[in-house]
């Protein structure tokens, strides 16, 4: 929920201040939110999460019911991420708001002329992005069994790279959830492959 409010803050700032490019606002608030997190935590990891939070990051689903000879597991986090990707695909491709998001990304002035409430949709988009970022942070904290103030440092660069590799435009109006999924997979393969000795 905190992530959603951080995203809403960005969306309101961009729409009210009429920022020429959203990167100005989002990069500025990135440092504000990161500094606030360090201030609240005192710069040290926070531990003592509930079993439910640990389950998000470290939980496993036993797949022996599929008739496999060996005990195989599927991480809960993989299932959660797959569900999020499916829901976002359905939202962007099968709802009116999803179509409006593409229209606003392509040409906000034309979308406004077509009767779309651009500011409202932008606030919704930034709120949703903040909610999903918070959800991802919760999974990461569950995986590490503690919240590190510097966890996810420079993850924004990986996210931007994955989106661009997946065919999304930094200027808006282009991109698909499946393309972003492919970009995430490519980035994961490259990152893991480069870490091998």
Residue ranges and their predicted role:
Residues 22-100, 121-124, 143-152:
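Transmembrane helix-bundle core of multi-pass membrane transporters
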Residues 1-29, 182, 186:
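Alpha-helical transmembrane segments within multi-pass membrane transporters and channels
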Residues 8-13, 35, 85-87, 134, ...:
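Alpha-helical transmembrane segments of multipass membrane proteins
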